[in-house]
Amino acid sequence: MAKRIIYNEQARRALERGIDILAESVAVTLGPKGRNVVLEKKFGAPQIINDGVTIAKEIELEDHIENTGVALIRQAASKTNDAAGDGTTTATVLAHAMVKAGLRNVAAGANAITLKKGIDKATEFLVGKIQENSKPISDSNAIAQCGTIAAGNDEEVGQMIANAMDKVGKEGVISLEEGKSMTTELEVTEGMRFDKGYISPYFATDTERMEAVLDEPYILLTDKKIALVQDLVPVLEQIAKTGKPLVIIAEDIEKEALATLVVNRLRGVLNVAAVKAPGFGDRRKAMLEDMAVLTNGQLITEDAGLKLENATLDMLGTGRRITINKETTTIVAEGNEQAVKARCDQIKKQMDETDSSYDKEKLQERLAKLAGGVAVIKVGAATETEMKDKKLRLEDAINATKAAVEEGIVPGGGTTLAHLSPILKEWADKNLEGEELIGANIVEASLTAPLMRIAENAGSNGAVIAENVKTKPFNDGFNAATGEYVDMSSAGIVDPAKVTRSGLQNAASIAGMVLTTECIVADLPEKKDSAAPAGAPGMGGDFDY
C-alpha cells in the first residue's frame, strides 16, 4: 500500500489533532462530577462507561496520521492501567497538557531533544517528591477511602473492598463475578492464584476480555511434559462422557498435544484449557502438591508411581470455578478446609526450620496463596449496561487499593500534583538552565491540568481554583463534590501514590516521544470507488436499475 510521509511542524500538528480528540473525550469523565461516555457497539446494547482506558481503546479515527496521535496517548493510559490499574484519565490529561505546552515551544524554535531531557529530569525529581509525601496505609478505613474515590465516590464499594482485604489479607486475591441480584455482595472462598496464564489464546472462552472461565472443571495436575496426545486420550475420553470442562496444569504441553487440545476445544468436543505449572524444580512440584490438596486431587507424578495414561477421574482435582487470562490463573475450590489447614501447618513448620530468607519468602508466598483464599465480589445491577459500568469501576477500585497498600497514599483530587508545581519550579530554577529549564517548566505548567479539569467538570473556574490550592498547605485541596477547600486526608479524598507516580511517568514519556517526532510515515487513505452511474432513460439500456 502507498504511504504518506509528512515532516516537521505539519507532522506534529497532525499528531496533536488526534491527541486533542482523544484527550477531550476521556477528560469529560474526570472527577466526582465527571460525565459518562456512551460507546456504540456493533452487536448488543451501547455501553455507558466512566473509565478512561476503555474509552481510549474504542477511539479509531479515519485519518491515519491523527490516529497515530490517538494511539500514542492511548499508550499512556494503557501503561498506567497495567502498572497501577487506575489513574488512566489523569495520565491522559497530563500527557495532553505536556504535549500542548511542548509543541508551542518547539514551534518557537526550541530544541526538542533538550526539552525532553528537561522533562525527564523534572519527572525524576517529582517521583522522589511523591514518594516523600506518601503515607503508608495503616487501617482498613484508609483502604475504604481509596476504594471509594476510585469507584467514583461509592462508599459502599470502598467499604466492601476494605472488608475483603481484611478477610484475605494483603496477599489475598479479590476477583469479580456478575451477580444474580440487584445488590453487590461479598463472598470469601478458598482459592489460589498463580502467575501463569493459558498456553494458547485459543483456550479463551470470553474473547472480549481474553479470559478462559471454566465452571466446575476437573483439574489434571502433573509435573511432566505432555508430548504425545496418546498419553491423555484415556482421561479425555472419561471426561468427555461427564460433559464437564477440564483444566490441565503441567510442566509443559508440546506442539502436537497442544494442537489436538485446541482443535477439540474449537470444535466443541471438550471444553479444555491448559496452563504451565508455576515455579521451577522442587518448588514447582511443591506448588502442584498445594494445588492437589486445595482441589482434592492427586499430583500425577512418576515419583509416586502414577502415569498419565493410567489416570482416572478420581485422581483429578475439582474446583468451583477457574479463571485463566494471559498472565494469571485463579482456582476457586470449595469444601476441603481440613486438608488445606493441615497443609498450611506443614508450610509454617518448614518456615520455622529454614534459615534461608529466600526460602522463607517463597514459603510465605505459598502460605498466602493457600490460606488467603479468594474474595469474590458479586456485582449486582438492574441492567446489563449498568453491570458493565459497575464492574469497570469496581476493577479500578480494587486495583487502587492494592496500589495504595504497596506504595502508600497521597492527597487526591489532583491536589498532590498541583502542590508539587511550585516546588518543582523552585528546584528547576536552581538546578537547570536553558532549554532543559523550559522542559521542566512544561511539566510544571501541566501539573495543575488534572485539578483544573476536575474543577471545570464540576462547573467551577479551574484556573482560579488551581492558583488558590497552590497557596494552601500540602494536604489541603478542592473537594469538587461539595465545592469547598478541605483537608483532603480528613475528607477521605486520597489517591494511591503509585497511581499518581505511574500516570506522571507515562504522560512524560509519551510527551517526550511526540515532541521529538520529526517525520510520520502512514498509509494513504483508500479511495472509495464511486458507484457506476445508472442507465439514463433513452440510453437504450435493456434493464431497469
From Swiss-Prot:
InterPro entries: Chaperonin_Cpn60_CS (IPR018370), Cpn60/GroEL (IPR001844), Cpn60/GroEL/TCP-1 (IPR002423), GroEL-like_apical_dom_sf (IPR027409), GROEL-like_equatorial_sf (IPR027413), TCP-1-like_intermed_sf (IPR027410)
Physiological role: Together with its co-chaperonin GroES, plays an essential role in assisting protein folding. The GroEL-GroES system forms a nano-cage that allows encapsulation of the non-native substrate proteins and provides a physical environment optimized to promote and accelerate protein folding.
Reactions the enzyme catalyzes: ATP + H2O + a folded polypeptide = ADP + phosphate + an unfolded polypeptide
Similarity field: Belongs to the chaperonin (HSP60) family.
Keywords annotated in UniProt: ATP-binding, Chaperone, Cytoplasm, Isomerase, Nucleotide-binding
PROSITE patterns according to UniProt: CHAPERONINS_CPN60
Keyword Coiled coil among UniProt keywords: no
Locations listed in the record: Cytoplasm
Subunit structure: Forms a cylinder of 14 subunits composed of two heptameric rings stacked back-to-back. Interacts with the co-chaperonin GroES.
Ranges in coiled-coil conformation: none
GO terms under biological process: protein refolding
Stated name of the protein: Chaperonin GroEL 2
EC number(s) on file: 5.6.1.7
CC terms in the record's Gene Ontology section: cytoplasm
UniProt GO molecular function: ATP binding; ATP-dependent protein folding chaperone; isomerase activity; unfolded protein binding
One Pfam family cited in the UniProt record for this chain: Cpn60_TCP1
Positions bound to ATP: 29-32, 86-90, 413, 479-481, 495
Main enzyme class: isomerase
